[in-house]
Swiss-Prot record:
Keywords: Repeat
Top-level taxonomic group: Eukaryota
Protein's recorded name: Pentatricopeptide repeat-containing protein At5g24830
Family statement drawn from the similarity comment of this UniProt entry: Belongs to the PPR family. P subfamily.
Keyword Magnesium: no
PPR repeat boundaries on the chain: 120-154, 155-189, 190-224, 225-256, 264-298, 299-333, 334-368, 369-403, 404-438, 439-473, 474-508, 509-543
Record has Repeat as a keyword: yes
UniProt cross-references to InterPro entries, sorted A to Z: Pentatricopeptide_rpt, TPR-like_helical_dom_sf
Classification via NCBIfam families: PPR
Organism lineage string: Eukaryota, Viridiplantae, Streptophyta, Embryophyta, Tracheophyta
């Protein structure tokens, strides 16, 4: 047909038919890529990958388009002129266009495959990391399996994310299996991979396997670093393995990482902390001496570990000495340093020194925190110096540091224990003015103060106010009121409170029943007290010797030793481990004398 066209031996109608045929050929040529794709790449893999991404912009559709319109001349009047050279030119152009189109198609398929692989790897790896961070480890493992099945292996960073997620979730066996798979099919695990798995093994107390993995790292061409050693040493210290008798083990661990590396401050800190916790003060100070000899720079963390260890062992003089050495070396004490010393002084009852150190702390430019005030306020209240504790509470407010509700409760309870309910109410009102909401412990402290002063009506009023502020009374609330009612002889009121407890779903405890037994004995209703005691035993509540002792003492005072002895035998039947049995007989003997 091309020969006829070039010679001009066709009519216009035939020419139109030929044009339609060539347009059909163009349509077929546009779809050749779909027909030839299975030849250049695997059909299943190609379709799966191509569905993941859009067609790359670099691959244009006209690369494989056969420009047949150029085969025809624009000349319409051929005048029956024969031109054999034109025929060969047309055939040559057709062949060249077909070969160019075939080469372009092959290049397009190869580019599509390469683009799809890299893009899928990046997208799927990102999804896997997100799944690990969200804790969806099963989905991440499933995606990894699918990627490997399709010939795409996630990178090392993605595998490390997966290892970290598995270890944090406690799936240590899966993490161990993943490392083995990485060694077999890639990517090869690095030091971070091993550190993650070793830390996971140590977290589940499998230190033996962690040590084995640590020792086999060199076999796979991975040299442990300082992080690896820190993890191992910390785990061994927690287990109590590293001590005076096995210092050689520590040296082997350190030699495995970097033979010429200086002594690591983190390892030294871990060792000293472990020694102090195990009571090995001398060994801890030997580590410090070795640090000084090797010129290892000490920071505030190292000094805080030493000072805390010395304070725990009661060596306050040495603790002060290290604080002075700390300042000489240009390391400023921080809030943890002062809190450690203040806490130790309060435990020893040296509140004047603790308060002076608190002032030194402020003068030195270190702002006290909640713990600094909490230690002193609690210590002063326990020691009975509530007014001074209240001064520290006010000092917090002046420093724009709002005390937590616990500190308010401690001061209110301190005043309440000494019967100073007016001061307790003043602190409560100040607490409310600063927007701190009272809780059940606040009200219990106030009730305790009223009960201590014999003001049962005021205590009852506080209980009713609790319910109006949507604070539910607890067992302690009822025990305080019930005990006060029994002490004042209001036995009926005490049992009303007991019934209210049950209605409100508040479970009585041994203190509740002990107060009721005491009230019944005080009223002389001993048989009912014995009956209540039997009911207590039937409920299965853990019972101590106190209610038996109250009842036995009452029988002894009434010169009824036989019944007192029966109570003692009932106590023997309980076999309570908390108190020795002869204690009741000793009290009974004392009462008889």
């Amino acid at each position: 047909m091309a020969l006829l066209i070039s010679c001009g031996e066709v009519t216009s109608s035939q020419f139109t038919v030929f044009r339609l045929l060539n347009q059909s050929l163009d349509f077929v040529s546009d779809n050749v890529s779909r027909l030839l794709a299975p030849i250049f790449t695997n059909l299943r893999d190609f379709e799966m990958r191509l569905s993941c991404i859009e067609r790359p912009p670099s691959i244009s559709g006209n690369h494989s388009h056969l420009c047949t319109e150029k085969w025809f001349s624009d000349q319409k009047d051929y005048d029956q002129k024969e031109d054999p050279e034109a025929i060969f030119n047309v055939l040559d152009y057709i062949l060249k266009s077909s070969l160019d189109r075939l080469a372009s198609l092959r290049e397009s398929v190869c580019q599509t495959k390469s683009f799809d692989y890299d893009d899928c790897l990046s997208i799927h790896s990102s999804i896997m990391r997100d799944l690990c961070l969200q804790g969806k480890l099963d989905a991440a493992l499933w995606l990894r399996k699918k990627m490997i099945y399709s010939g795409v292996i996630p990178g090392l960073i993605t595998h490390n994310h997966l290892l970290n997620g598995l270890c944090k979730a406690g799936y240590i066996e899966k993490a161990d299996g993943l490392v083995r798979e990485m060694r077999e099919m890639g990517p090869s695990p690095n030091c971070v991979s091993y550190n993650t798995l070793i830390k996971g093994l140590c977290s589940v107390n499998n230190v033996d396997k962690a040590l084995y993995l640590f020792n086999t790292m060199n076999k796979y061409g991975i040299r442990p670093n300082r992080v690896t050693c820190n993890i191992i040493v910390h785990a061994l210290c927690q287990k109590g393995v590293i001590g005076n008798n096995n210092k050689k083990l520590l040296e082997e661990i350190l030699d495995s990482s970097q033979a010429n590396a200086p002594l690591d401050i983190v390892i030294c800190t871990i060792l000293m902390d472990s020694c102090f916790k195990n009571g090995n003060v001398v060994q801890a100070l030997e580590v410090w001496k070795e640090m000084s000899q090797k010129n290892v720079p000490a920071d505030s963390v190292v000094y805080n570990v030493i000072i805390r260890g010395l304070c725990s062992s009661g060596n306050m003089v040495a603790a002060y000495g290290f604080m002075c050495d700390m300042v000489k070396r240009g390391v400023n004490p921080d809030v943890f340093t002062y809190n450690t010393l203040i806490s130790a002084l309060c435990k020893e009852g040296k509140f004047d020194e603790a308060c002076d150190l608190h002032g030194t702390m402020q003068n030195g430019g270190v702002a006290p925190d909640q713990i600094s005030y909490k230690v002193i306020i609690q210590g002063l209240c326990i020691h009975g110096d509530v007014n001074r504790a209240n001064e520290f509470l006010l000092s917090m407010l002046k420093s724009s540091l709002l005390p937590e509700v616990l500190l308010w409760n401690v001061v209110i309870d301190g005043y309440g224990r000494y019967g100073d309910t007016s001061s307790a109410l003043s602190v409560l009102n100040l607490m409310l003015s600063y927007g701190v909401k009272p809780n059940v412990y606040t009200n219990n402290a106030l009730i305790h103060g009223y009960v201590k002063g014999g003001r049962l009506i005021d205590a009852w009023w506080v209980k009713n106010e609790m319910r109006s502020t949507k604070i539910h009374p607890d067992t302690t609330t009822y025990n305080l009121l019930l005990g006060a009612a029994c002490t004042l002889g209001h036995l009926r009121l005490a049992f009303q409170l007991y019934d209210e407890m049950l209605r409100r779903g508040c479970q009585p405890d041994i203190i509740t029943y002990t107060e009721l037994v005491r009230g019944l004995c005080w009223k002389g209703r001993l048989k009912k007290a014995e009956s209540l005691l039997s009911r207590i035993q039937a409920t299965g509540i853990t019972i101590d010797h106190v209610p038996f002792l109250i009842l036995a003492k009452k029988y002894t005072r009434l010169q009824r030793p036989g019944e007192a002895y029966l109570v003692y035998k009932k106590w023997l039947a309980t076999r309570n481990r908390g108190v020795s049995c002869p204690s009741i007989l000793n009290h009974m003997h004392t009462e008889e004398q």
